[in-house]
């Protein structure tokens, strides 16, 4: 994920007005978007000029008031009052009390509550997706799709609520049963990043809930309105079912709240999505108290196109993986390795495809490419482009800031770098694609694996043997290993996460539910004898 200067803040809330030829008069800038007629739909989500950013059964907040901005024009949307440390303490206590009620509810009935949450999200999918587009900056279809991911994981969790459980194992002693018992860990803290302000919370929240846990969420400060809106939807479901709202608590805040969560022994599992740099600090703080952490950190993902690749698949896949969400996905393709025999043709096709990308306001349904999330991200983009040039790279497409309001940069292609160039080994959260030539399978598999991160990877080939070598022990060392599809766009049915400096955590489908539970091995003697294990006699 995107590197940040302040630990656990995930990214800082913007406070200054946009400078430049498109600056608006102060009187206009003082008008929040939520008060303008074209944004009246925000109030359908229960939002207003100033919103309370703490929920633990009731709404409140005694911390700093921040303003969130629209990345497409850098105009203020609305304000959110963040949590103070005292708010955090109160919320944790209420969440722990709520757990005593929630843990006693049978898992299938917990699944019914999660089903209702999914249905409530369905009802608000368009308006909530529009808020994601407005506050985060991703295009509308991606904003709606992100809410759909939360809906989908709710559906998945409902089914899982009737299936979670451990096996009965054969005992070596007659008259004995050996059972694996799974119980909820208790309180799950969830710290999410700006780039997926709905879906990542959903992956964690839905599964954690059916496992019998309560959740405490700290979203990114710059997407605080999304955190508030989602929590309002969930809170209504809980309140309608006469359940404690603190089952799904919210504490909007920055580094102080994130640090408190990481150090708090009452937080039994902390799920953190963010940069590798900050994730290391989180991991150390949690490990120092022997807690559990689920880390989903950086990705420096590669696509490999072999000489037998279907170029009608390679080009659109590389395009979507590199510029989707303006290069701000953790699964964004940042490195493209092309066999030397097809390198020039693929680069030329990519340049033509890049020239056809429709740029504009992200909530316009015809737009495919929106802004970066903050002005800081624009600066990081420019710094990376200059560093690539210094290291011998050639910008063959893009490389500049767009002359328009908002945080828009040109999607960029860089060729000519060495595979081991330091900038190519640095995750820059921006739409920059580094393109390399390779000669053979052995070297390119090694190049894929030589970066510190290990999230997502993909090859394009028709060679069945090569596919299985790619999937095997000497192939990709990533958590997501694809064939003939992009590096981005994971489905909820599979466990999501990566290896090495990506953190090793897994969210969403498969058996990721086990991370939200603790396992006990239970031996039950239902005989009248007392045989010891391994045939030991102790008389």
UniProtKB/Swiss-Prot annotation:
Provide the catalytic activity annotation: nonanal + NAD(+) + H2O = nonanoate + NADH + 2 H(+); (S)-2-amino-6-oxohexanoate + NAD(+) + H2O = L-2-aminoadipate + NADH + 2 H(+); betaine aldehyde + NAD(+) + H2O = glycine betaine + NADH + 2 H(+); an aldehyde + NAD(+) + H2O = a carboxylate + NADH + 2 H(+)
- Family assignment? Belongs to the aldehyde dehydrogenase family.
Instruction: Give the annotated active site.
Output: 296, 330
Q: Does the keyword rRNA-binding apply?
A: no
The reply to whether Acetylation figures as a keyword in the UniProt entry is: yes
- Where in the sequence is N6-succinyllysine found? 94, 537
- Tell me how this protein assembles: Homotetramer.
Query: What organism does the record attribute this protein to?
Result: Homo sapiens (Human)
Report any one BP term from Gene Ontology. Answer: sensory perception of sound
Q: Where is the transit peptide?
A: 1-26
Q: In which pathway does it act?
A: Amine and polyamine biosynthesis; betaine biosynthesis via choline pathway; betaine from betaine aldehyde: step 1/1
- Give the UniProt tissue specificity note: Abundant in hepatoma cells and fetal cochlea, ovary, eye, heart, adrenal gland, liver and kidney. Low levels present in adult peripheral blood leukocytes and fetal brain, thymus, spleen, skeletal muscle, lung and tongue.
Q: Which disease is it linked to?
A: Epilepsy, early-onset, 4, vitamin B6-dependent: An autosomal recessive neurologic disorder ocharacterized by a combination of various seizure types. It usually occurs in the first hours of life and is unresponsive to standard anticonvulsants, responding only to immediate administration of pyridoxine hydrochloride.
**Keywords attached to this entry:** Acetylation, Cytoplasm, Disease variant, Epilepsy, Mitochondrion, NAD, Nucleus, Oxidoreductase, Transit peptide
Parts of the chain that traverse the membrane: none
Q: What name does UniProt use for this protein?
A: Alpha-aminoadipic semialdehyde dehydrogenase
Q: Entry's PROSITE patterns?
A: ALDEHYDE_DEHYDR_GLU
Its ancestry begins with:
Eukaryota, Metazoa, Chordata, Craniata, Vertebrata
Q: Where is the PTM N6-acetyllysine found along the chain?
A: 94, 462, 500
Query: Which enzyme type, at the first EC level?
Result: oxidoreductase
- Positions binding NAD(+) in this chain are 192-194, 218, 258-259, 274-275, 296-297, 427
